[in-house]
Curated annotation (Swiss-Prot):
This is Light-harvesting protein B800/850/890 beta-1 chain. The keyword Metal-binding applies. GO terms for biological process: photosynthesis, light reaction. The lineage of its organism: Bacteria, Pseudomonadati, Pseudomonadota, Gammaproteobacteria, Chromatiales. It is a single-pass type II membrane protein. The chain crosses the membrane at residues 20-42. It comes from Halorhodospira halophila (strain DSM 244 / SL1). Residues 43-53 are periplasmic.
Length: 53
């Protein structure tokens, strides 16, 4: 176990994986935010003072 982590990845491989993971996560989150905004514009899921009227 010379200089290996629990995953078996080297430090460089772990950093590369992390950057790809974070980029993918941010893209997924951005798509989710846009989808929620569009769904809210189509049909808000929290009624206003007047209800769903």
């Amino acid at each position: 176990a010379d200089n290996m982590s629990l995953t078996g990845l080297s430090d460089e491989e772990a950093k590369e994986f992390h950057s790809i993971f974070m980029q993918s996560f941010l893209i997924f989150t951005a798509v989710a935010v846009v989808a929620h905004f569009l769904a809210w514009a189509w049909r808000p899921w929290i009624p206003g003072a007047e209800g769903y009227g």
